[in-house]
Amino acid sequence: MRPLCAFDLDHTLVRSSLDLVRLKVEIRALVETEGVSLSEATRAWTIGQIIAAATAHRETLGEACWALCTMHEEVAVADASPEPGAHEALSALRAAGYPLAVWTNNTGTIARRALTSCGLDGFFTVLITRDEAALKPDPSGLRLLEAAFPERRIWVVGDSWVDGAAAQAGGAAFIAYGADPVELARRGVAPRTVLRDLRQLPEWLRTAAW
């Protein structure tokens, strides 16, 4: 039985202008403007952690942060294009019998729009978004994938340390794509491999030992 390949969306399957560093700066500024003190140590927090702190301070502030996230995502999806090699890699994996899924921190609406506009929607039978599961690096999305694909091992493919941390926390194997090995190591993420071209993935999986 082939393992499941679960892909992150932005900067893994889809190339877009979504700038998570800029978004994080804007969310921090919004939260601090509303009287929430964020220490220097919180600069290592994920966007989700900052929004959780904002929500604990005031629910409407958390909602404002999520609205800012959605605005950035909607702007980014308008100019989204397939990541180089995505079509070829997914076609080869499907032909080889691998089930395919998407696991993203985006909303379902944005994720479906991005996949459709890039011509990738037909490859996937399951889509896990922040509408269904907590944000990565929380591994709860992995539990949903396991329920959808029982008895299958799972490879998680993504560009960020949060993808790897979520995979590791949930007991899945992580394949990094275009990621910075130094940042992965700093975050305690140990990928099975780091690929620079998605078209390398089918052949790598063919010879990979679990």
Describe the predicted segments one by one:
Residues 80, 102, 154-155:
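Residue-level marker of alpha-helix boundaries and capping positions
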Residues 104-106:
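Conserved phosphate-coupling serine/threonine residues in phosphotransfer and NTP-handling enzymes
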Residues 97-98, 172:
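A short helix->loop->beta-strand "cap" motif at the edges of active sites that frequently abuts
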Residues 1-3, 108, 112-210:
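Asp-based, Mg2+/Mn2+-dependent phosphohydrolase catalytic module
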Residues 1-96, 109-112:
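N-terminal helical cap/lid subdomain that shapes the substrate entry/recognition surface
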